[in-house]
């Protein structure tokens, strides 16, 4: 779990997301409150519940990107889901309880990976011994083994093909688990029968380099106690878990269309106990959702936040509004962020030995066209930049292998040449941009 201060969290988000200060501050405070709660005495800690957040803003302004970056910062079990994937209990489809099951699955993987790091040195030694045994033979003398150990450390054996016994991870009884049904916490048939077939190994041929990760993971898992991993993961989910529910507006029944879709309000009703605090059965044991932080987001361009069930609105007390992006924001997105599209295209073209230079007026022209098309066609926010950039680089991307060694300057004239006509014709831009 992260111990970053709110200022540090916002600063980290600023590297990838332009603007949206209010939303960044809200998630930063929510994340810091997880840490603050951990410092409290046990009796008071149980009484402090997370303040769930509702992010409202048009498409392409950074709602999903905030969640993606938050997941990396949180160092806590994190899951992002789309509300549209779920149906009311009783209908065909996934029910909302599977959110918690997926969160637990993610936590198990994350916890196991973290614990593997703790036993990495011992696992590396055991994996090394297995490789040497495969290369030199089981009955090799100590002197021979040490010679091969030296070669292994110098990388001289990386391309040597060896035959080793590795765990067979396939579960022949997987077909007994209908989607979502095998995790109901009652009788997981695939799990029961899978254990009967467990412990099997299969002999595989691979190079020494390929065997490294497989053997490291196997040896690390032998040193780990599954029950300890499970207990740590469940504790992390219950105390620090974060669930980001995207497209929450798509399960709103609009006020002028009451009764049009039974499943929509049903999904909201099913979310109520989950967000308020309930116990969900998973194949690893029961999970209490009382202290899981829920962040919901939606564009709300058709439905309104008030179209959500009043009870659900009450369970999302903190509301932040994200503003639409302007042309100036687009310029900053293309030039200031750590993952800017300009940097990505430079790196992609560099693989073909084609140098790319973006001038200030070139970036301004790209931003101007994206903003203009958003105004005249449909405002899809920063996602419009993907389309504009792809059209500008379409010709160059196709011919790049034949232009190796060239230097290309993307200025206003270059953008106009590749995109000007399309941007000026509203009929063309409606379909192409």
UniProtKB/Swiss-Prot annotation:
Protein keywords: ATP-binding, Chaperone, Cytoplasm, Nucleotide-binding
Pfam family, one: AAA
Molecular functions per Gene Ontology: ATP binding; ATP hydrolysis activity; peptidase activity; proteasome-activating activity
Main location as per UniProt: cytoplasm
InterPro entries named among the record's database cross-references: AAA+_ATPase (IPR003593), ATP-dep_Clp_protease_ClpX (IPR050052), ATPase_AAA_core (IPR003959), Clp_ATPase_C (IPR019489), HslU (IPR004491), P-loop_NTPase (IPR027417)
Top-rank taxon, per record: Bacteria
Binding-site list for ATP: 18, 60-65, 246, 311, 383
Localization in the cell: Cytoplasm
Gene3D superfamilies for the chain: 1.10.8.60, P-loop containing nucleotide triphosphate hydrolases
GO cellular component: HslUV protease complex
Biological-process GO terms, alphabetical: protein unfolding; proteolysis involved in protein catabolic process
Residues of the signal peptide: none
PANTHER family: ATP-DEPENDENT CLP PROTEASE ATP-BINDING SUBUNIT CLPX-LIKE, MITOCHONDRIAL-RELATED, ATP-DEPENDENT PROTEASE ATPASE SUBUNIT HSLU
Function: ATPase subunit of a proteasome-like degradation complex; this subunit has chaperone activity. The binding of ATP and its subsequent hydrolysis by HslU are essential for unfolding of protein substrates subsequently hydrolyzed by HslV. HslU recognizes the N-terminal part of its protein substrates and unfolds these before they are guided to HslV for hydrolysis.
Subunit structure: A double ring-shaped homohexamer of HslV is capped on each side by a ring-shaped HslU homohexamer. The assembly of the HslU/HslV complex is dependent on binding of ATP.
Family: Belongs to the ClpX chaperone family. HslU subfamily.
Protein name: ATP-dependent protease ATPase subunit HslU
Organism from which the protein derives: Cereibacter sphaeroides (strain KD131 / KCTC 12085) (Rhodobacter sphaeroides)
């Amino acid at each position: 779990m992260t111990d970053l201060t709110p200022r540090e969290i916002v600063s980290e988000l600023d590297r990838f997301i332009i603007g949206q200060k209010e939303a960044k501050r809200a998630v930063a405070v929510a994340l810091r409150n997880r840490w603050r709660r951990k410092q409290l005495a046990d009796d008071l800690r149980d009484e402090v519940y997370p303040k769930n957040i509702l992010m409202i803003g048009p498409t392409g302004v950074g709602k999903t990107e905030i969640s993606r970056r938050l997941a990396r910062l949180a160092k806590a079990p994190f899951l992002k889901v789309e509300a549209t994937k779920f149906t009311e209990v009783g209908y065909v489809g996934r029910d909302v309880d599977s959110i918690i099951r997926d969160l637990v699955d993610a936590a198990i993987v994350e916890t196991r990976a973290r614990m593997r790091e703790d036993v990495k040195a011992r696992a590396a030694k055991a994996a090394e011994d297995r490789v040497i045994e495969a290369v030199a033979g089981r009955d090799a003398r100590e002197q021979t083994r040490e010679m091969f150990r030296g070669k292994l450390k110098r990388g001289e054996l990386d391309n040597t093909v060896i035959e080793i016994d590795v765990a067979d991870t396939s579960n022949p009884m997987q077909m007994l688990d209908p989607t979502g049904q095998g995790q109901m916490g009652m009788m997981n048939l695939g799990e029961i029968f899978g254990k009967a077939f467990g412990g099997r190994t299969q002999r595989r041929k691979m190079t020494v380099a390929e065997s490294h990760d497989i053997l490291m993971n196997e040896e690390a898992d032998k040193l780990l106690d599954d029950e300890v991993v499970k207990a740590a993961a469940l504790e992390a989910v219950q105390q620090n878990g974060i669930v980001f529910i995207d497209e929450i507006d798509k399960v709103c029944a609009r006020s002028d269309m009451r009764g049009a879709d039974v499943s929509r309000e049903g999904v909201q009703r099913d979310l109520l106990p989950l967000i308020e605090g309930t116990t969900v059965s998973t194949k690893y044991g029961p999970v209490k959702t009382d202290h899981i932080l829920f962040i919901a987001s939606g564009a709300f361009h058709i439905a309104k936040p008030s179209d959500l069930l009043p009870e659900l609105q009450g369970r999302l007390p903190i509301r932040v509004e994200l503003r639409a992006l302007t042309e100036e924001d687009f310029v900053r997105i293309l030039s200031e962020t750590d993952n800017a599209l300009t940097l990505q295209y430079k790196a992609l073209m560099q693989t073909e030995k084609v140098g790319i230079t973006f001038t200030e007026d070139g970036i301004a022209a790209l931003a101007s066209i994206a903003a203009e098309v958003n105004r005249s066609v449909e405002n899809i926010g920063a996602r419009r930049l993907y389309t504009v950039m792809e059209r500008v680089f379409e010709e160059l991307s196709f011919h790049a292998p034949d232009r190796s060694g060239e230097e290309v300057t993307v200025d206003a004239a270059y953008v106009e040449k590749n995109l000007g006509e399309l941007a000026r014709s509203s009929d063309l831009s409606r379909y192409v941009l």
